[in-house]
Amino acid sequence: MAEKPVLTKEERRAKREKRREIQREQNVGRAEKMHKARLEFERQEESADPLQGLEGDHETLPQYQVGCSGWYYWHWRDHFYKDIPGKDWFKHYSAEFETVELNAPFYSWPTIATVKTWIRQARPGFIYTVKVSELITHIKRFKGTKTLVKDFSHIADLLGNQMGCFIFQLPPSYHYTPGRLKDILSHLDHTRRNVVEFRHASWWNEDVYKAFRKTKTIFCSCSGPRLPDELIKTADEVYVRFHGIKRWYRHDYTDEELNVWVQRIRASGAERVWAYFNNDFDGYATKNAKEFLKQIKKST
């Protein structure tokens, strides 16, 4: 059998870019199908409470929602998933944690069938937080996206009480301007639990906090390189993403480093805490998430 040709670095990059281009084209088609599904759902639910099917019920949702940013990592097979077959990985993850932050929807707009799979595979009470499609945040950058946001938010109608937050992550090149702040807040569906994560430090300012508080939009606090290291509270609930302190995704948090955030959250008086660990290297995320949850429960 002939050996596969070894691709150069440039060829591998071109191949990846081609895949991404195809995926982005598919996202447009999937968004159109979700749009039709949302309109049909709204026709059937015209007489229902407009907040029906909204994210997990505030009365029954646990106060601490702590988990990882994704669960299907091949490099966890020798750590978190040791001796567990791949088909059982989600079952194992959901037995250890009550929530997951899904990153895949950022790259691939979910189909209705995909969302139904999420529902089927999850145990009762398990909560999904969903990262919003790059079509909205990175390609269109909140320009002419009101309908797209509503269409993507239809996922919450499908998940019902298994829905947590929608996390909108903006790129590092997207720096603060008053116009961009207005674009974001005017395009969000404020019947949902919205979280916005910025990767440019200019967004850490009082004008942003004031506008977020007015709309009850959650400002995502970040533990990440070159970003302000502080907890920002703009709603009754707080949301923190742990990416790593000096290096993205590769930092193993010490107990002391986690405790700094526990104390900040405790001092904030937040009604609910959403915390997701994105430092997936070497399975650090699962270990750190468990330790963080233990500490924050102990602090109350």
What function would you assign to each model-found segment?
Residues M1-T300:
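Residues lining hydrophobic/aromatic ligand-binding pockets adjacent to catalytic sites
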